Amino acid sequence: MKTITVNGQPRDTAAHDIAALVAELGFVKGAVLVEHNGTALRPTEWPGRALNDGDTIELLRLAAGG
């Protein structure tokens, strides 16, 4: 278990990478933008991007409408 910061809030997680974290949080791939320690990531980068204790994640849910 590691402690990371997600959207400014501390959170304990067992996720080993960004893809696992996105799934753990219930987001749908393609419906969320992810920034990891200040770097914006493409969804193709999520599976290989390891999470470490103290990392900072910003998530932005995309919504369409009119």
Where in this protein do the model-derived segments appear?
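Ubiquitin-like/PB1-type beta-grasp interaction modules and other compact soluble beta-rich domains
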Residues: 1-65
